[in-house]
Amino acid sequence: RDTDRSRGLGDVYKRQGHKTTHNILATKAFTVSMGTADTVAQCDYVGIVSGNKEPDKFAKAGFHAVKSEFVNAPLIAELPMTLECELLTYDKESCYMTGRIVNISADEAVIGDDGKIDVFKLRPITYDPIHHNYIALGEKAGNAFSDGKALK
C-alpha cells in the first residue's frame, strides 16, 4: 500500500453502544475505509450487522483486519483506500466525533500515473439516503476551481 501523510480533519457520527464507538473511545483512533462498487454487499453487511451480536462479521463479509502503522485501529485489507485518524473530540450527547487524518493509505491498484489516487480506478460508493441505494462515483462532471470562472 502506498501512503500519504495528511493533516486534514475527518468528522464521523457513531452512536453510543456500538462496538466501534467503544473501540474508538478506548484507543483514541479510528480508520475510515472506502467502500467500492466491487464491495457493495460486503460493506452493506458490516454496516447493518452489529459487532456486539456477530463478533466475526468481518470474516463473514470476507474481510480481514490488519493493523495500521500510523494509528491504533485496524485497516480492512480488501478495501483499497483508508483514512487513518486520531480522535480529537467526541460529544457524548450528539455522538459526533472529530478526528485528525494522520495518513491516507491506498492500494497500488487505485494509484494513477501521476502517483495520486485515481477515482476512476477506485470506483468509490456513496449512500443515497432518499432512495436507499449505493451509488458508484466516477464520472467527471467538471473542472474544480475553473468552470465557475466563466460566471465572473
Give the residues covered by each predicted segment:
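Single conserved hydrophobic/aromatic residue that forms the stacking wall/gate
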Residues: 2-13
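Active-site-proximal mixed secondary-structure blocks
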Residues: 16-152
